[in-house]
C-alpha cells in the first residue's frame, strides 16, 4: 500500500472486510483500485469515490454489476450528458434462471434444486432468491445514475420464494411473465429504488431475458430506452470486466487523468416507498356466494384502489378471483388487502404481485 512503484491494485477478496479498509488505504495513498466486490461498492461506494477524487486516484468496478454486460462505463461516459429518469433491470442470474424454469413448468423447489446442481445457486440461496444480491447492485446503479447512495434499509426488497407455477399460468393468460426486477426512478415525484418480482408484458425487452442472463434498461429524456444484455456473472465474464477495467485504468494513468466518473446529482427528494405507485395482480380464494365480488370491490374502493379487470373461476363451493388494478400507492393497496383478508368470504389471499409500469 505504501510502495510508490505500484500505481494500480486489483481487489477480489470477497466480503466487505478487510477489503474495504484496504481499498480506502490504497485510494488515500493515490493508487487506483479495481474491484469486483459489489458488497463493498454498495456499502460505501460514495465514500470511496470521494476518497479517490480527493487523492487524484480512480476506482473501477465494472465487474461489480452484471459483469458480462459493459453497462457502467456507458453510463459514466457515453451518457454523461443525458438526464436519466429510470434504470431497471434483471441483475441476478440465479433468480432469473429459476423463474425461467418455472415459466417452463417447474415448481419453485425443483427450479432451485436444478440451479444448485448447475452451480448457479449457493447451498444457502438466500441472497439470490430473496433479492439481496440484486439490491446491492441496484444501490451501485443508483450511485452512478442518480448520484444517490441509499442505505440498505432504504431499498425495498422482496424475493421470489413465494412465486408459484400457478402465478405463471395466470401471468401467461394475461400475456405477461414474471421477473425479479430492480427498478430505480428519479423524476418529478422523487427518487426511489426497489427490487421485487413483477408481472411484465411479454413485449417488454426484459420479458425476453431468459436463463441466467442479465439485462439493464436505461431510460432518459432524450434516449427513450437503451437495453444492455448478456451474461451477468461467472468466472469468464467477471475476468473480462476486470481486464477491461485494467485497460481503462492504464489509459487513465498514461494520460495523467483521473476522476473519470463524474457523478450525477439527484435533483429530487427521496420518495417514501409507501407512496410509490404500481398496478397490482391479486389472486384470491373465496366462497362462491352472492355479494362476494361486490364486497371485495367495495373494500378496494374505500381505499381509492380502482379495479381494471376481474376473472372469476368456480371450483365447487369455492371460486378463484384474479384482479388487476389500476395504479395505486403501496400503502393504499396494503390497507385494502389487510381489510379484505378479514372478510368472512375470503378463504385465502394467494398472491399479491406488482405489475411493471
Across the structure, where does each feature detected by a protein language model lie?
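Rossmann-like NAD(P)H-binding beta-loop-alpha module
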Residues: 53-133, 140
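A short hydrophobic/small-residue beta-strand
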Residues: 32-34, 307
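A structured beta-alpha segment of the ubiquitous adenosine-cofactor-binding alpha/beta core
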Residues: 1-8, 12-18
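A conserved regulatory-domain signal marking ACT and ACT-like small-molecule sensing domains
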Residues: 246-357
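ATP-dependent carboxylate/acyl-activation modules
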Residues: 204-275, 279
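Conserved active-site and cofactor/substrate-binding residues in soluble primary-metabolism enzymes
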Residues: 4, 43, 66, 70, ...
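Rossmann-fold NAD(P)-binding glycine/threonine-rich loop
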Residues: 13-29, 36-77
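Substrate-binding/catalytic subdomain of NAD(P)-dependent oxidoreductase enzymes
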Residues: 101-102, 110-208, 213-215
